Regions:
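An N-terminal, well-structured beta->alpha segment
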Residues: 1-41
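Glycine-rich phosphate-binding loops that contact phosphosugars or nucleotide phosphates
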Residues: 33, 42-111
Length: 111
């Protein structure tokens, strides 16, 4: 059992190490630093289905590290929850296809 857990943790650590640090990744990190740390905005994550679960996990993980973050359900955003968005907030929208209707609509509705 201990060996299985150890192997799982090693696989997870390797997966993190395998994340490519590209120009786009560096730009995303700089944008987060600028909008959240310098301009005092918050990270607002959103996604539908499994992508929504991932977005929710990202928001809670960021919160636990002291980075203001909240999950916004894209369907609820269309029915009054857009009020959570404020100046300098940064939207992180997650979609497997990039064509999820609710996410596309959220980009149109966002201030």
């Amino acid at each position: 059992m201990i060996d299985s857990i150890k192997q799982l943790l090693q696989q997870e650590a390797q997966a993190v190490l395998n994340i490519p640090v590209t120009d786009a990744y560096e730009k995303a990190v700089k944008l987060i630093v600028e909008q959240i740390h310098q301009k005092k905005g918050k990270l607002v994550t959103s996604g539908m289905g499994k992508a929504g679960q991932i977005a929710m996990n990202i928001a809670t993980t960021f919160c636990s590290t002291g980075i203001p973050s909240v999950f916004l359900h894209p369907s609820e955003a269309q029915h009054g929850d857009l009020g959570i968005l404020q100046k300098n907030d940064l939207l992180l929208l997650i979609s497997n296809s990039g064509k999820t209707r609710e996410i596309v609509e959220l980009t149109r509705l966002s201030p």
